[in-house]
Structure formats: structure tokens, C-alpha cells
UniProtKB/Swiss-Prot annotation:
Catalytic activity field: a purine D-ribonucleoside + phosphate = a purine nucleobase + alpha-D-ribose 1-phosphate; adenosine + phosphate = alpha-D-ribose 1-phosphate + adenine; cytidine + phosphate = cytosine + alpha-D-ribose 1-phosphate; guanosine + phosphate = alpha-D-ribose 1-phosphate + guanine
Enzyme nomenclature, EC number: 2.4.2.1, 2.4.2.2
Protein name: Pyrimidine/purine nucleoside phosphorylase
Alphabetized UniProt keyword annotations: Glycosyltransferase, Transferase
């Protein structure tokens, strides 16, 4: 199931822009203090670092990801998720716009 709408959150209106605009996101804060981000990655191959563990939920498009220390690229599409350990890196390869929700912690 793909998340299509998020209700009852505070949205930071200033966008987070990374990699010369290849990734753009906005921060969400839930009433209980939970933080997430929602964004899009445009066609590119990028490397992201994590502080906290992350779950990347694909809500549109698709991507391939490669976790730090592995050789395999894994494809995910709308309605699928992948987990990234904290204090690590992952590569993401996108050939069409990849829309996501990033769940932290």
C-alpha cells in the first residue's frame, strides 16, 4: 500500500535541497514529535549518509539502492520500502522521479 496523504503534521516550508537540486525534501513533524521527510529524487546516482536508522518508503516511481558494504543493487517501486542502518551510507540510482517518505529512527 502506498501512502497518498499525510494529515495532522507540521510542514517546514523551506525545502532541503541536495546534490544541486537532484533531491528536494520537506521536513514533517507529527504531534507526538516524530519526524519524517517527504521528497523526490530526480534521475541521478547519489550517495547519502545516515545519522539515525531510516526507512525509505517509495510512494511513486522507482529506484535501485545499494547499502554500504554490499555489492548488490536492489530495485524498489511504489508501495515498497527499504531500511538503512544508522551511521552508514547508501547509494541510490534513479532513472525516473522517485517520490519517497523517509521515516527516521
Amino acid at each position: 500500500m502506498t501512502t497518498e496523504k499525510i494529515d495532522g503534521v507540521s510542514v517546514t516550508t523551506q525545502a532541503n535541497v541536495y546534490f544541486d537540486g537532484k533531491c528536494v525534501s520537506h521536513n514533517l513533524t507529527y504531534p507526538d514529535g516524530t519526524k519524517k521527510s517527504v521528497g523526490v529524487v530526480l534521475p541521478a546516482t547519489l550517495t547519502f549518509g545516515t545519522g539515525a536508522p531510516e526507512i525509505m518508503e517509495c510512494v511513486g516511481g522507482s529506484c535501485e539502492y545499494q547499502l554500504d558494504g554490499t555489492d548488490a543493487w536492489v530495485k524498489v517501486g511504489a508501495g515498497e520500502k527499504f531500511s538503512v542502518p544508522g551511521n552508514s551510507k547508501f547509494n541510490i540510482r534513479v532513472t525516473e522521479a522517485f517520490h519517497y517518505i523517509c521515516h527516521y529512527g
